[in-house]
Regions:
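Short, structured segments at the rim of ligand-binding sites
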Residues: 1-234
């Protein structure tokens, strides 16, 4: 089978490591019948980059802050958000990258920097699709116009995330323009505390909890329990 752009490849990596006959050629993957039994594999599950993105997002918008995140997955198909943070002006260093069962894992150091706007295109979207709500919040504090296109998949997540992002950022005072497949945000802008409409979406709730760290006044969520879907301890 094939895919238009490179997407998450955890399944392919795991199958290869247990002895499956799997081959990859650019964006095409083929699996041949293998009469051999697959080999057992010990796996230490690394820290999830989509969850870590919220803490990294806090560093991005809070001056003079820094953070070390331990044992985080750095697989390039999942690391687009962190690559974008570096492009926006943050200092980001991999401290001890290694391979765990075929997956790249590292401690990372992140330090706040002066934020500048970036553009995200369709080819980049798969590597940061779940982190776009947090990236949108960060973009409100960046100098210039951040543009995200090719993210139509956000329309069919736990909520229509394009609508959810735009609704809440506009309420907070951000300058944001909607596209069918994304949006643009012009910054930096001062955010105001409001009641956040989460649309029952855990990533919207967590992204705007981080936004509240730099918003004036009080920010409340209309539904906090939805974060239990992915991060009950958040």
């Amino acid at each position: 089978f094939s895919e238009p752009f490179l997407s998450r490849n955890h399944t392919e990596i795991m199958l290869k490591n247990v002895g499956a006959n799997i081959k990859k050629n650019e964006n095409e993957i083929s699996i041949s019948n293998n009469s051999q039994k697959l080999d057992p594999l010990n796996i230490t599950v690394p820290s999830d980059p989509s969850t870590a993105a919220f803490f990294a997002g806090a560093v991005a918008i809070i001056p003079k802050s820094n953070l070390i995140i331990n044992n985080i997955l750095t697989n390039p198909t999942r690391f687009g958000f962190f690559t974008s943070l570096k492009e926006m002006g943050l200092e980001l260093d991999l401290l001890s990258e290694k391979s765990e069962a075929g997956e790249l894992v590292s401690d990372i150091f992140i330090k706040h920097g002066e934020l500048k706007a970036i553009e995200i295109n369709e080819e980049q979207v798969p590597s940061l699709i779940d982190e776009i709500p947090m990236l949108a919040v960060i973009a409100t504090q960046a100098v210039g116009k951040t543009i995200i296109r090719g993210a139509r998949e956000l329309r069919v997540k736990e909520s229509d995330r394009i609508e959810s992002i735009i609704f809440n950022l506009k309420n907070m005072g951000a300058l944001i323009e909607e596209f069918e497949d994304g949006f643009s945000i012009t910054g930096p802008t001062k955010l105001n505390g409001v009641i956040i409409k989460t649309f029952g979406d855990h990533r919207i709730a967590m992204a705007f909890m981080i936004a509240s760290l730099v918003a004036s006044g009080t920010t409340k969520l209309d539904n906090y329990e939805c974060v239990n879907i992915s991060f009950p301890e958040f």
